[in-house]
């Protein structure tokens, strides 16, 4: 039996023996990936598995030593093998099923992975402080920042302020304004920013357009990084929470098409859980830096 986990910034999902368990417990700001998984595993039903496939945010494109992950999965589930996977690779495999192209995953953060005849490239995934441009944290932080400023009389965009009414109240309720709860508030505010843009807020539209342009740059850099050219026709899938907003996706696609005119935009065939499951069953060797395996040594008597 195989345990499949998809750990993101805004939540996590696990699949054991066909049963899926969704949680709003994700990787907290400043928390190690192993500590995040331990907190999630404590809430999962007791099970025995042979293999664990862990698709995780927080690696920034370089998967760390898999041995602590093997020890953790062995402790909770008796796992003998573990595949530790950058969430971008899991998203790529799940969405395109091996086709040449780029998968842009937008959650609280941003990760873009391309595959071009077995050459892989990874872009962004740099974390919310210095990267993840155009992602949920980025959108929500900018939107809530401007809403708070407008409330103080620094600007006048009542459409934005109205769209962020609940988020402003949530900010006021924060005991610490720059801790993990504040980061989570920024991520959950992304949908308010996009809704405000849809409602005609000039401030929100400007933020949305900038985010779309930055994400297009990320996609193009990812394709070129895998040895592609601007004359190619890669498949491009855009997935994740903010991608549920059609106007944001359209803006991203329009920006991509200006540089990659033959790009083919496709719907994702599957998600990170599907990708991690496929990797566990088909990619049995390391594909560093995005995939590393660890196997428990056989006991001798």
Can you say where each PLM-predicted feature lies in the sequence?
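Glycine/charged-rich beta-loop-alpha catalytic/anionic-binding loops adjacent to active sites
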Residues: 73-81, 120-127, 255-264
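Glycine-rich beta-strand-to-loop/alpha-helix junction loops that act as flexible
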Residues: 53-59, 106-109, 234-244
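Conserved strand-to-helix beginnings and helix N-cap segments that scaffold or border functional pockets
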Residues: 34, 63-67, 136, 249-250
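ATP-binding/phosphotransfer module of carbohydrate and carboxylate kinases, centering on a glycine-rich
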Residues: 1-48, 95-100, 144-301
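Glycine-rich phosphate-binding loop of actin/hexokinase-like ATP-binding domains
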Residues: 99-150
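Short beta-strand-loop/turn "lid" adjacent to the catalytic site in phosphate-handling enzymes
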Residues: 25-26, 42-84, 93-96
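Small-residue-enriched, tightly packed secondary-structure blocks
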Residues: 88-95, 108-112
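Active-site nucleophile and cofactor-binding loops and adjacent substrate-binding regions
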Residues: 82-90, 105-106, 133, 264-274
């Amino acid at each position: 039996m195989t345990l499949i986990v998809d750990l993101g910034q805004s939540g996590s999902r696990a699949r054991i023996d066909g049963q899926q368990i969704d949680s709003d417990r994700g990787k907290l700001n400043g928390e190690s990936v192993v500590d995040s998984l331990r907190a999630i595993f404590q809430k999962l039903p007791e099970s025995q598995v042979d293999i664990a496939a862990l698709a995780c945010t927080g690696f920034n494109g370089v998967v760390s030593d898999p041995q602590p992950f093997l020890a953790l999965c062995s402790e909770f589930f008796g796992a003998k093998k573990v595949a530790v996977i950058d969430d971008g690779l899991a998203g790529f495999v799940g969405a395109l099923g091996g086709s040449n192209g780029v998968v842009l995953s937008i959650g609280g953060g941003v990760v873009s992975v391309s595959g071009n005849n077995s050459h892989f490239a990874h872009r962004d995934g740099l974390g919310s402080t210095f990267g993840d441009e155009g992602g949920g944290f980025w959108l929500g932080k900018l939107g809530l920042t401007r809403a708070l400023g407008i409330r103080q009389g620094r600007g006048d965009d009542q459409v934005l302020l109205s769209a962020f009414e609940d988020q402003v109240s949530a900010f006021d309720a924060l005991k610490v304004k720059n801790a993990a709860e504040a980061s989570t508030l920024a991520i959950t505010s992304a949908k308010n920013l996009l809704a405000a843009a849809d409602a005609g807020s000039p401030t929100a539209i400007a933020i949305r357009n900038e985010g779309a342009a930055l994400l297009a740059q990320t996609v193009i850099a990812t394709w070129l990084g895998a040895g592609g050219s601007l004359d190619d026709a890669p498949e491009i899938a855009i997935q994740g929470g903010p991608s549920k907003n059609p106007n944001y996706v359209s803006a991203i696609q329009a920006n991509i098409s200006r540089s990659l005119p033959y790009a083919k935009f496709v719907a994702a065939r599957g998600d990170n859980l599907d990708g991690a499951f496929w990797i566990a069953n088909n990619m049995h060797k390391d594909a560093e830096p995005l995939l590393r395996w660890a196997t428990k040594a056989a006991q001798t008597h």
